[in-house]
Amino acid sequence: MYDRKLPVKLGRGGIHNNILMQDAIERGITALQHHADTIHDYDVSKVIVIGTSALRGAANRDEFIEKVRELLGWEIKIIDGELEAALIFRGVRLSLPDRMGKYLIMDIGGGSTEFILANDDQIIWKRSFNIGIARALETIQMSDPVTSSEILAFEQWFDRHLGELWSICNQHLPRTLVGCSGAFDTFMDIYEKEESDLKIRKVSEFPLEAYREIHQRLILSDHQTRGKMIGMDKMRVEMIVIASVFTNFILRNLNIPKLLHTHNALKEGVMDLFISNGI
């Protein structure tokens, strides 16, 4: 399967005011035009375009949607947080073994972060929280490298939004955190010293001690140092530190002893739904 990600930062500068800035709209259009060229090269007959947090919350989203329609002929389907979480679960579940017990899926985005608590192939609870990394960085200014007081401020900000997560997990006590795609791909690439996008994975265990060592490297590093790390995805150099602060905070607060990584997430869930039922 062809897999390509392009950095857009659609919510930059306006996500807290629920607006798309003009430069962000232009970056989004440019990225979609690049994807359109690839789609043409592969003679693809069906295109599904999904909009998530930055679009669903933007007051001027129709401007972006109309430009995409005019330029490319594509209709963007904006999904709510509940459906996004359900599709993430559908994609992640394809990569997991049948017997998992209780586990928590975490998908860190720019505008939102999705958590899904499950037992084997059954969802117990799911929720999309508007606490993505782009929102965090527009709320709290981060030094380079990040300071201990800033880490505490980020953790307190996450904590204020996650009461429902703490409550449900204290009832069900998941023993595994499954980190999917995005930042977790980069954590694993750094661990395995693989250049980003050169390795196709299904699911793999991420030793906690190895993750903690990477976390320490990230929070002590400046932007230039991170950019030189083997395995670092260049589009994540800016946001990977806070993604790791968030991940470490979840592992520590919930006392979860096992970490898994999967590349599967939303797009695999969308494809599986399309293949199974149409969308």
Predicted regions located by residue number:
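Short amphipathic
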Residues: 2-6
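Helical "lid/coupling" subdomains associated with nucleotide-phosphate turnover
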Residues: 8-9, 13-42, 52-102, 117-122, ...
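A generic, well-ordered mixed alpha/beta core segment in the N-terminal half of proteins
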Residues: 104-105, 109-112
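Conserved beta-strand/loop subsegment of P-loop NTPase cores
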Residues: 45-49
